[in-house]
Amino acid sequence: MAKILHIFNTINSLRKRYYIAAAGKQSLIKLLSEAEVAEQVYNSNAIENSTLTLEETEKILLQINLDRYITEREIFEAKNLARVVSYIDTRAKEQELTLDVILLLHKMLIANIRDDIAGRFRKDGEWVRVASHIAPDPKEVVERLEKMLAGYNANSHENIIKRIALLHLTFEYTHPFIDGNGRIGRVINNYLLIREGFVPINIKFIDRKMYYEAFKEFEEKGTIRIMEEIVGKALTNSYHKRLAYLEGAQIITLAEYAKKYKISHSNLINKANRQTIEAFLEKGVWKIGVRQNKNNL
């Protein structure tokens, strides 16, 4: 509990710094968002067992030919998700999240992959299973999602990390679609974060084991501690990255930082993983913003 409370307090502090640093820098913020799309797409698809690497994902989005055969499905998965990620970056500020919005996002995601199921919830008789979890009866989907959104909105006084964690677990437990639930669920997280004035998060493929443990915890105990930690760390990581750029820090790798200041690299990595230093993961590499006259640790 103490760890989660610390993350809650850290987020509030980082958010205030971000608003100060972001003033008059909308063009830089836009560039950071655009540069992040490929990483968002790669990680979200990789969690769902896509074989694409980050480099291959970037090439597909830039319409560059790849060196190996890629299925048409994986190509559309990358392009469609990139379109959705870019769409919500502006749309979330204009439109409240509703079931109709969720259906639209799903239609954009699954188009040209499974047009027969794109943009609709599971119908009567369409059951789905994820590992040992059998999703609720299709007849319950709409009611469960309406209750999920109502609960999220009613708890506006709660910390955003707790609200996002609970909503995400509830959405994935419901598994309202035949396909695309995980990717849409992570998109919804960012839709709500952006709408509430926070920065989007990127749940990393390297955290997949912990991510699935969060679902197991929720199903078996009804608790959300692990997902709170995942969302909290992802949010601090996102703020650390943006603040490094917006505050004009010199951005170097943690390996370079360790060498320059004669600090244990493995110790820095451990701190970065816990997000107890202002490090951030960018394209699979841990980095940190070095500021003059400031202790970065």
Region annotations inferred by a language model:
Residues 1-179, 183-297:
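FIC/Doc superfamily catalytic core
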